[in-house]
Every structure is written in structure tokens, then in C-alpha cells.
Amino acid sequence: MVSIRPDEISSIIRQQIEQYDQEIQVSNVGTVLQVGDGIARVYGLDKVMSGELLEFEDGTIGIALNLEADNVGVVLMGDGRNILEGSSVRATQKIAQVPVGDAVIGRVVDALARPIDGKGDIATTDTRLIESSAPGIISRKFVYEPLQTGITAIDAMIPIPRGQRELIIGDRQTGKTAVAIDTILNQKGQGVVCVYVAIGQKASSVAQVVGVLQEKGALDYTVIVAANADDPATLQYLAPYTGASIAEYFMYKGQHTLVIYDDLSKQAQAYRQMSLLLRRPPGREAYPGDVFYLHSRLLERAAKLSPQLGEGSMTALPIVETQAGDVCAYIPTNVISITDGQIFLSADLFNSGLRPAINVGISVSRVGSAAQIKAMKQVAGKLKLELAQFDELKAFSQFSSDLDKATQLQLARGERLRELLKQQQYAPLPVEEQVAVIYTGINGFLDNIETKQVSAFISNLRENLSVKRAKFGEIIRSEKALTAEAENLLKDAISDCKQAFLSNI
């Protein structure tokens, strides 16, 4: 018979008492009162933060936006078809975060940075909050480095420095996206990480952009964030913030980044839809009262950081679509007041054959020539003046039939300057070629060449400089100035080209 020892039993009980770990899990749970149109009303979530992620029974995630006395207004990040009235909702005590890091480069992701390109998961452990504070005044440095777009009209007259926010504004089908894509293509080999955010666009349009970037080898340094037209309004609202978070990761590592938001008009419309469904009071054009803050907190995240923070930068190129050229509408005026300047694309110029259709008269960069190399400053000042005088004379000449010789010559030169600013799509020019092209125009070397022949002459000149006089490009790239030696090389190239060109006509 087995003997029972009381001391042994008591020691076993003592061990089990010591190992006992009482853990009470308290979860904040609510009940769905109403659901529909991408919005859910939830009762019982007493301890929930604004912007907190909530999980529904079917696995759908939502964001708490409206905190009211008796319910919480939640926007859904999915279709929410399986959410029923009376089903439970759990607070996660988390704010929306997205994966970031080098592994994201070259990928196409959705508004929550989940891959949608069929290339598998993104192998990264780093995350950033979708909404984070913009750098303060002490954290910033004055912008001074040029971000070359490869578009002559912009780099010469509306220069963009690294860390600036420059608005691209114009009617639909005026080439806004083309300007942005050219800018991405021109960053090849410059060490700039590009983020292209497509908001509310057709999937076919996004696929076309991906195809162009892949073909030109630009996808190797670009991330594409896509919230397509068929995605919920919540994802279209979040996509720009996700793009900014991805770019911020590289900025705080001391790298240079470029973010393109295409376009913020659609984000504002998605936010208006959400706000009206949440029964927030409508304001001008039915937008909610905080629509200015929607864009200001996004665009303020673009900055040139101080040396203490690594001197990284985030340059933002937001795009806004206008209706019939009306820049005085609510969203355009808001974004114009937030940004550091705007590039205005005109439908009239586009239809007249001037592409890119940049209206230099009302386009502006508030930083100006601080973002230009010395060589560009040497030639760009005269170009602005010549074009301004040309526009004035052209308007005047419509009312006068007999013009003096000097006026006729100035009008002829203006026509040729306009012609040399034309560029093919997806063919950005390096800065040394831009300097050569502008120098040729402003110094009258094109005056005896027919306007329709200017494009062919410029093409021959660029080829001559790159093949026979490569030293010209080397001097501009290294010295950043149009030295006497570079100017002589350029004059020789122009002379050779003119001789060959005029003999063939």
C-alpha cells in the first residue's frame, strides 16, 4: 500500500500556488448600431482614441474618426459586406502603421503598404505611423540644392530645390502626370528615392505609369502607392499619408526623396464623402471645415532637415486638377497657399502644341534661383526677360499691323525661344544640355533658322556636344558654371551645327 506523506502533498500544493499567474485580459468591445456606405456607427466603445484602429467580427479594420457622446463613427478600410448590425467591434489600442524600408523600393503597394504587384511579401520589420508630426523649425535647414526635373522650362524659370513643395496645377489632360513622371526619370543616378502616390485613378493608368518606369529603369529607385478608383474612400484618403511615411523613413536616414501626390483633388473628394456620411457639418463646396488641415499636415512633412538630423530631404510635388482653368476654386487656393510655388499647365498652350504646356507668366517658385547651379543662373535670367517681353509684344501686335524692324526681330526670337522649350514626353534633359539650349536661343544663334527647324537644330547640337565635345558636359557638371572654356566649346559646336544645317537646307 502506497503511503501518503502530508509534507510531500503540501510542498506540491505550494509549488503550484507559486506558479499560478493570474492574468485578467480586459478588452474594449462595442456593438455595431448601423453600417453602410463604408461607415459604421458603434455603441459601447467608451475608451477609444481618435484615429484608433478597430477590428470587426469579420476581420475588417476600421478607423475611429467621430467620437460622439453616445456612439463612435468608424470609417471602414474594406467593403464591410459581412458586418451585421449587432456584431461586436474590438478596440486594438493601435494607430495605423505601415511597413517601410529598402525592401519597399521597386514595389507597387496599396494605401496600407500591402503589396499588390504579385511579387510576394515585403521583407521588412521597420514600420512608421501613417500620421506623424512634421519637422519643427529648429529641425529644418534653408533649401539650397537643386532637384533637376529635366524639363528646361521648369529648371530655368521655376526651379525646384530639394525640400520644397511645388504644386503642379491645371485642367485634366494637360500633362500634369507627364511632368511628374519626367521628374522621376531624371532622378536616375542622383541618389533620390521617389514615391509616386496614385489617388483615385484607373488601374489601367497606374499600370501604364508602372510600365514606363520599368521600361526606363526608374522602378529601381521608386515606390508606387496606389489607391485606385474602385478602392474605398478611406484608402484614397490615407494613400498620401502612407506615401509621406515611406519617404520620411529615407529622409531621416539622411537620403533625398521625392514624393508625387497624383492628385490631391481626389483625396479631398474622398474626405468630403467620408465627412458627409459621418454627418459632419459641410462648408464651402460641401467640404468639411478641416479640409485645409487635411492637406497642410501632409505637405508640411516635406522638409530639408538640419545637419544634426542628417540633412536628408523630402520634396513634395502635389498635383491638383482645376475645372476650366479656375485656380480660384476652394481646393486649388488652399493648396496654393500651403505650397512654396506652383507650375500652372494651360489647356490653351497644350492645344496650341506647346508641350509641356507650362504657363510661365503665372507659374512661380518662391525660392527662386537659390535652387539653381551658377551655369543655369548665367543663362536663365535673360530667358525670363525675353519671354516676358515676347508675351507683352505679342499681345500688343494683335492690335497693330505695321511693326518696326526691332519689334519684328524680338517677336521672331520669342517664337524660337518658345520652340526650344518644347520637349518630348519621357525625355528629360540633363542640366548641361539645358544650359547649352538656352544659351543658343538667348544669344541670337537661332535667329536665322526657321521656327519649324529649331527642334531639329537643337537635336543636332545636343548630339554634337555629347559625341564630339563631351568636355563641355564635364565642365558644367564639375564646375557648375559656364566657364570661358565651356563657352568656347559651345560656340564651336553651334558654329559647326549651323554650317552643316544651313548647307543641307
Swiss-Prot record:
Family: Belongs to the ATPase alpha/beta chains family.
GO CC, alphabetical: cyanelle thylakoid membrane; proton-transporting ATP synthase complex
Binding-site list for ATP: 170-177
Subunit structure and binding partners: F-type ATPases have 2 components, CF(1) - the catalytic core - and CF(0) - the membrane proton channel. CF(1) has five subunits: alpha(3), beta(3), gamma(1), delta(1), epsilon(1). CF(0) has four main subunits: a, b, b' and c.
Required for activity, annotated site positions: 363
Enzyme superclass (EC): translocase
Swiss-Prot/TrEMBL catalytic activity: ATP + H2O + 4 H(+)(in) = ADP + phosphate + 5 H(+)(out)
Pfam families recorded: ATP-synt_ab, ATP-synt_ab_C, ATP-synt_ab_N
Family annotation (SUPFAM superfamilies): C-terminal domain of alpha and beta subunits of F1 ATP synthase, N-terminal domain of alpha and beta subunits of F1 ATP synthase, P-loop containing nucleoside triphosphate hydrolases
EC number: 7.1.2.2
Protein name (database record): ATP synthase subunit alpha, cyanelle
High-level lineage: Eukaryota, Glaucocystophyceae, Cyanophoraceae, Cyanophora
Entry function: Produces ATP from ADP in the presence of a proton gradient across the membrane. The alpha chain is a regulatory subunit.
GO molecular function, one term: ATP binding
UniProt keyword terms in alphabetical order: ATP synthesis, ATP-binding, CF(1), Cyanelle, Hydrogen ion transport, Ion transport, Membrane, Nucleotide-binding, Plastid, Thylakoid, Translocase, Transport
Localization terms from the record: Plastid, Cyanelle thylakoid membrane
Topology with respect to the bilayer: Peripheral membrane protein
